[in-house]
Regions:
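Conserved ABC transporter NBD signature motif
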Residues: 73-81, 90
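Catalytic Walker B motif of ABC-type/P-loop ATPase nucleotide-binding domains
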Residues: 172-176
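H-loop/switch region of ABC-family ATPase nucleotide-binding domains
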Residues: 208-209
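Conserved beta-strand-loop-alpha-helix hinge in the C-terminal portion
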Residues: 228-251
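Helix-to-loop junction immediately C-terminal to a conserved catalytic motif
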Residues: 65
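Conserved ABC ATPase "signature" region
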Residues: 125-142
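Conserved ABC ATPase signature
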Residues: 147-151, 155
């Protein structure tokens, strides 16, 4: 009898609003960024999150990594409410790879090893883990001594992705992870992501506008528009041509159909 997938992540009517001007700290009228978002993520899912600019996609990932807190609603990781999980513990299970990579002045070697040190791995285990993922991502050894300023934008993005993969989290959150990579590297990364659950029991949620990549990647698609979850479909239910047209229209008006 086939084992039923477990619900790993659950959002219940999650909303998020910005309240403060970051520069003046003066109170501003509250404006909603995400509104009443509810969905479930099953273990091993590969979830694509797409929608027009300003839909709140990146903010959703920030909430899932607890870089921001919901204004309303609740998020659960394996039946534990997020606010009951220590932040350090949560981020060992849920890893966020941001769109803008920053190595914070560290060498590539230190940037990749640091999250593994936090996991209390031995030096040998760290070296083995780094070697494995560098080989998978085709990162050459001579990058290890380089700092952020000695890497191109695409190289920094690849190293940033490696930082997310080396800890082999339960859930990996990716924000436009291939936006500065060439076609061959992008295809290799999509292939790696598709095998993550089989090899490392990792669930993946990825924000991306490139529908050809999403078609190759996802088992489920979430479509956001104006901060609302407009559609939650299995990949087999998605009309990709209609979705492409919807994204084009959404940049200029509010029509929704796919």
């Amino acid at each position: 009898m086939e084992k039923k997938p477990q619900i790993q992540l659950k959002l219940e009517q999650v909303s998020y609003s910005e309240k403060l001007n970051a520069h003046t700290k003066h109170k501003l009228p509250e404006y909603p960024i995400l509104q009443d978002i509810s969905f479930e993520v099953y273990q091993g899912s590969r979830i694509a999150i797409t929608g027009p600019s300003g839909a709140g996609k990146s903010y959703l990932l920030r909430l899932l990594n607890r870089l921001s807190e919901p204004t309303n609603g609740k998020i659960y990781l394996e039946n534990r409410e997020y606010r009951q999980i220590p932040t350090i513990e949560l981020r060992q299970s849920v890893m966020f790879v941001a769109q803008e990579p920053k190595l914070l002045g560290m060498s590539v070697r230190d940037a990749l090893a640091y999250p593994l040190v936090l996991q209390n791995l031995s030096k040998l285990q760290i070296q083995q883990r780094l070697s494995y993922w560098m080989e998978q991502l085709h990162i050459p050894d001579d990058w290890l001594g380089r700092t952020e300023t000695q890497l191109s934008t695409g190289q920094r993005q690849l190293v940033n992705l490696a930082r997310g993969l080396v800890i082999q989290p339960k859930i990996l959150l990716l924000d436009e992870p291939t936006s500065n990579l060439d076609i061959a590297t992008t295809s290799r990364i999509v292939e790696i992501l598709n095998r993550l659950y089989e090899k490392h029991q990792t669930t993946v949620l990825m924000v991306n506008h490139q529908l050809d990549e999403l078609q190759m990647f996802c088992t489920q698609l979430l479509y956001l528009q104006q901060g609302r979850l407009m559609s939650n479909l299995l990949a087999s239910q998605v009309s990709w041509e209609n979705l492409q047209e919807t994204l084009k229209q959404a940049e200029t008006d509010d029509d929704f159909e796919f």
